[in-house]
């Protein structure tokens, strides 16, 4: 698991540590990543949506959860952005959802959703990730 909170930049030295292969998992795919995302646009000390998605894609965890939100974006709007990042075309997105999706660079489809109070994440010995909110989507 990798947890990246209250950050607006990751040095190449830190990326070198994050990118190292693991003895127990030579494929080096993290099961879970938790990535900072304060608001739609970046802040001096926090990622915005674009930066969070770019970091999540580089980490390439089986599941990525965003955390550290302000109040500008609703939970459901973050879910719509996460579904888009995963390759789903939004049906009837709101104008705000369209604006947030427009912030995201083109790139690899990954699983990404907002975290929330009470979220429980379980990782099995085999690396299967389940949670108490989104596992029904599979």
Which role does the model predict for each range below?
Residues 11-138:
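Binuclear metal-ion centers of metallo-dependent hydrolases, dominated by the metallo-beta-lactamase
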Residues 1-6:
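Conserved beta-strand hairpin/beta-sheet module of binuclear metal-dependent hydrolase folds
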